Structures are given as structure tokens and as C-alpha cells.
From Swiss-Prot:
Motif (Nuclear export signal): 425-440
UniProt GO cellular component terms: helical viral capsid; host cell cytoplasm; host cell nucleus; ribonucleoprotein complex; viral nucleocapsid
Protein name, as recorded: Nucleoprotein
Modified residues (Phosphothreonine): 279
A Pfam family: Paramyxo_ncap
Function text: Forms the helical nucleocapsid (NC) in a ratio of 1 N per 6 ribonucleotides, protecting the genome from nucleases. The nucleocapsid (NC) has a helical structure with either 12.35 or 11.64 N per turn, approximately 20 nm in diameter, with a hollow central cavity approximately 5 nm in diameter. The encapsidated genomic RNA serves as template for transcription and replication; encapsidation by N is coupled to RNA synthesis. Forms the encapsidation complex with the phosphoprotein protein P. Before encapsidation, the newly synthesized free N protein, so-called N0, is chaperoned by P.
Region (Ntail): 401-525, 404-525
Record organism: Measles virus (strain Halle) (MeV)
Assigned keywords, A-Z: Capsid protein, Helical capsid protein, Host cytoplasm, Host nucleus, Host-virus interaction, Phosphoprotein, Ribonucleoprotein, RNA-binding, Viral nucleoprotein, Virion
Record's keyword annotation contains Oxidoreductase: no
Gene (name only): N
Transmembrane segments: none
Subcellular location: Virion; Host cytoplasm; Host nucleus
UniProt: RNA binding residues: 180, 195, 202, 260, 351
Family: Belongs to the paramyxoviruses nucleocapsid family.
Length: 525
């Protein structure tokens, strides 16, 4: 048996080990396409600001091709360094693209005010064609839809401080898009707006240079569909992190935004470690968790072997990311989610609608937190020198502070209330009759009358007065209402009616085991 266990441990380690590179053959290269990246050909701030202005307009042009859009974005991303060309050549190692650098200088003979640096060759026409200034119609179209403040006609400046503020504002909006461009592009707008408000309050960006939503959507879509662009951005982040000493302000801002980018798409793996293992509850000793604990141990070793690119494996489309999916350890993940929703309110809004989600182990995690509330770890107490009297005091305080948290209903609640189909009577309330039915109708009537007399906000207070005092608020519903102001009143009304019904059902007692089925179509609107 000992030999079998050793073989099993060795098998688990080798199973999740990444392939070993060998020198039997050369690197596999794909069919490359050329990306032209314009960079400043001199150290003039006017040249850089004019190039930034033309590239922002170019990205806002809907007729721009994908490779040209990628080149324009790489040019903007590298404008904050002293030598953009050296930076691009140093960090670029992409098997799918071949980058060509074009130095840009000022010109009074071109419509764009820029030309490509060359030895004795007139390149004004080519520069105008690249920056879409050869067609007056496209030139006029490119002036709209890039800044929300339509009074800004251009962003050409002469002083370095003003240029850095404008460039930092534009770069912040581009880098924020990376966090959810791959994992959750449909829900990215809210988080991006929160980041923008944060950096505006910190004076890291200038609010007047907020870019149009259409422009940001174009950039987000390009980041999502172009792996080469994401490879460049990740390589730039890693290069900034390796830089010793003080970094430029824009570089520090990029590192700050990286905290939202790092480990994107790895929430299941990270949260399972945080709530399932680091909490060290006794439930980890269950036999059901033995296999998944060894799997998670192998994945943690694999994560470390991948090096500095491991947190970006989803953004870089690394095929090994599938091993870190929660489907590889479903029981431990379900247990960790139960622990998480009890310990942190922010976990209540997570989506648990997975095919491998196990409600039994989810409830196990919840019960472990509830029954372990106020207990002090003897091992940690001995290491910290905590006496038995101090441990009892801590337990007593913790029990009082967690009573309110334990009494709240947190987590998925899909099975608590069942709604009838449309072919059933709207006013029918099964297992409610006589006195209870009249009380429901009375509470609804008083709520509607209060709404007519006092308005939406005061009517909500009036309805709240008829609720049982012991009925807790739905945290998940409240958070969703705060995120959608247009539906907040309707959601609050539905929540109050639902709580009124729940309060009535609690007064019935425990005579029946069949759950009550309510029918209120207003709750489904």
C-alpha cells in the first residue's frame, strides 16, 4: 500500500507538470503578418503630442483595418518612454507578427502635420494616407466620437508636464479595458467606470479627456480579438516590474492598474485556495477532499513553475489554463464558495450556476463558518502567546459581533421561492386562506395607497413598517438595485412584497413540509 501511495503521488505530480522544452528542433513559427508602428523620430514634445493626437483620431476611424489598429495602439502604449523603438524591439517576441517601426517627424507640407523620416524621399503623401488625411470625408468623421468633451479640437501641447497628463489619461483608459476584455466584456462598463472615478479622485487623470464610449468599445474589442496586442501589453507590464529604482509616474499607474489585470480568469482557483485551504477548517479532513486536495497541490506547484507569466495565463490564451478550472476540484470549490459567502459580503454576488456546483458541500462550508464562529485556534494562540483567558474573551466578543452576520441569508437562494406559471390564477395563494390571505391583500392595498399619497421613496418606508422586524434584507438584491438606479424602486417594491409573504409563512408554523408556492407576476417584471 505504501508503494501504491508513493506511485500515486508521483503520478499526480507528473500529470500536471508542463512539457519540458527540448533542443530537437527549432521553434514553431506561424504565418506572420506585418504591423506598422509609428514612433517619434525626435525628442520634441510637439512631435509626440501631434503623433498622439493623430493616433487617437486614427483609432476612432471605423474603417481602420485590424493590423493598422494594433500598430496604432502599440504606438500609443509606448509613447511614455524616452526611446519607444528600443522598448518595442526589446520586449517583442511574437511568433504571429512582424513589427515594422516608422519614425515620424514634423512637416509643414502635409495635411496631418507629420511625415515619415527618410533620406531625401518625400513621404508626406504616404503619411497623410496612413493617418487618413487623404480623404476629407474620413478626416471630418475622425474628429467626432473620440472625446466626450466636444470642445476639445486637438491635444497638441508643447510642455512635457501637460503632455504626460494627457497621455497618462488616455493610457489609463486603455489599460483598464484589459481587465475584463477577455473574461467578461459584457459587464466591463461598470468596473471601468469605477476605476475611472478612482483615478480622477486621485488626480492621476484629467476628467476633461474622458474618451467616448464608442472609442473605448473599439479598443476593448481589438484587445479581446488580438492575442499579439495582449502579448505586448503583458510583456510591457513585466518589463516595468523588473525596472529597479523609481519609475515614471505613468509606469507606476500601469502597475497600479495591473492589480485588476493580474489573475484575470483565475477566480475559482484563487478563491478556492483562499477560502477552502487558508481558513484551515476541520472539514478539510474529510475523505471526499483527499483527491482534490492533492490535485490542488499539484496545480499550485505548476503555477509556480510557470513563472512570472502564470497570473496572465488566461489573457495570454495559454492552453494549460483549463487545468485550473473549478471543474478539476468541484467538491472543494463548492465548499470554498460556501465559506466565502459567509465570510465576505462581496462573495454573495458571484455566479454559482455551474454544472459541477454541489449544494451539499456549499452548505457544509456555510455551516463550518457558522459553528466555528468565535473559536480560537489553539496552535495559533500558542504561537502568539494568547492565554486561555484572552482566548475566552476573544471568543465572547467574536460571538456577539457575528450574530448579525450569521442571521443574514447570504448566497444562492433560487429554491426559496417558487412562482406559478402564467396559466394559474394571479390571486391564488396555495396553503394560505382566510386570515392570512386577507392580511396579504391588506398589506398590498396599504402599500399601493401609500405610494399614491407619498410618492415612491416615502411609500417604500410606509410598506417597510408592515414587515416583520425579524425579516432580514436580501443583500444580493440590494446590491443589484444599487447598481441599476433605473430599476431600484421596482426591485425594492418587489422585495418588500416578497418579505411580507415570507413573514406570513413563518407565522404558520411547521405543520407542513411542502414549500409554499407564491404567484405574484409583479415580482417577475
Amino acid at each position: 500500500m505504501a508503494t501504491l501511495l508513493r506511485s500515486l503521488a508521483l503520478f499526480k505530480r507528473n500529470k500536471d507538470k508542463p512539457p519540458i522544452t527540448s533542443g530537437s528542433g527549432g521553434a514553431i513559427r506561424g504565418i506572420k503578418h506585418i504591423i506598422i508602428v509609428p514612433i517619434p523620430g525626435d525628442s520634441s514634445i510637439t512631435t509626440r503630442s501631434r503623433l498622439l493626437d493623430r493616433l487617437v483620431r486614427l483609432i476612432g476611424n471605423p474603417d481602420v483595418s485590424g493590423p493598422k489598429l494594433t500598430g496604432a495602439l502599440i504606438g500609443i502604449l509606448s509613447l511614455f518612454v524616452e526611446s519607444p523603438g528600443q522598448l518595442i524591439q526589446r520586449i517583442t517576441d511574437d511568433p504571429d507578427v512582424s513589427i515594422r517601426l516608422l519614425e515620424v517627424v514634423q512637416s509643414d507640407q502635409s495635411q496631418s502635420g507629420l511625415t515619415f523620416a527618410s533620406r531625401g524621399t518625400n513621404m508626406e503623401d504616404e503619411a497623410d494616407q496612413y493617418f487618413s488625411h487623404d480623404d476629407p470625408i474620413s478626416s471630418d468623421q475622425s474628429r467626432f466620437g473620440w472625446f466626450e468633451n466636444k470642445e476639445i479640437s486637438d491635444i497638441e501641447v508643447q510642455d512635457p508636464e501637460g503632455f504626460n497628463m494627457i497621455l497618462g489619461t488616455i493610457l489609463a483608459q486603455i489599460w483598464v479595458l484589459v481587465a475584463k476584455a477577455v473574461t467578461a466584456p459584457d459587464t466591463a462598463a461598470d468596473s471601468e467606470l469605477r476605476r475611472w472615478i478612482k483615478y480622477t479622485q486621485q488626480r492621476r487623470v484629467v476628467g476633461e479627456f474622458r474618451l467616448e464610449r464608442k472609442w473605448l468599445d473599439v479598443v476593448r474589442n481589438r484587445i479581446a480579438e488580438d492575442l499579439s496586442l495582449r502579448r505586448f501589453m503583458v510583456a510591457l507590464i513585466l518589463d516595468i516590474k523588473r525596472t529597479p529604482g523609481n519609475k515614471p509616474r505613468i509606469a507606476e499607474m500601469i502597475c497600479n492598474i495591473d492589480t485588476y489585470i493580474v489573475e484575470a480568469g483565475l477566480a475559482s482557483f484563487i478563491l478556492t485556495i483562499k477560502f477552502g485551504i487558508e481558513t484551515m477548517y476541520p472539514a478539510l479532513g474529510l475523505h471526499e477532499f483527499d483527491g482534490e486536495l492533492s490535485t490542488l497541490e499539484s496545480l499550485m506547484n505548476l503555477y509556480q513553475q510557470m513563472g512570472e507569466t502564470a497570473p496572465y495565463m488566461v489573457i495570454l490564451e495559454n492552453s494549460i489554463q483549463n487545468k485550473f478550472s473549478a471543474g478539476s476540484y468541484p467538491l472543494l470549490w463548492s465548499y470554498a464558495m460556501g465559506v466565502g459567502v459567509e465570510l465576505e459580503n462581496s462573495m454573495g454576488g458571484l455566479n454559482f450556476g455551474r454544472s459541477y456546483f454541489d449544494p451539499a458541500y456549499f452548505r457544509l462550508g456555510q455551516e463550518m463558518v457558522r459553528r466555528s464562529a468565535g473559536k480560537v485556534s489553539s496552535t495559533l494562540a500558542s504561537e502568539l502567546g494568547i492565554t486561555a483567558e484572552d482566548a475566552r474573551l476573544v471568543s465572547e466578543i467574536a460571538m456577539h459581533t457575528t450574530e448579525d452576520k450569521i442571521s443574514r441569508a447570504v448566497g444562492p437562494r433560487q429554491a426559496q421561492v417558487s412562482f406559478l406559471h402564467g396559466d394559474q390564477s394571479e390571486n391564488e395563494l396555495p396553503r394560505l386562506g382566510g386570515k392570512e390571505d386577507r392580511r396579504v391583500k391588506q398589506s398590498r392595498g396599504e402599500a399601493r395607497e401609500s405610494y399614491r399619497e407619498t410618492g415612491p421613496s416615502r411609500a417604500s418606508d410606509a410598506r417597510a413598517a408592515h414587515l416583520p422586524t425579524g425579516t432580514p434584507l436580501d443583500i444580493d438584491t440590494a446590491s443589484e438595485s444599487s447598481q441599476d438606479p433605473q430599476d431600484s424602486r421596482r426591485s425594492a417594491d418587489a422585495l418588500l412584497r416578497l418579505q411580507a409573504m415570507a413573514g406570513i409563512s413563518e407565522e404558520q408554523g411547521s405543520d407542513t413540509d411542502t414549500p409554499i408556492v407564491y404567484n405574484d407576476r409583479n415580482l417577475l417584471d
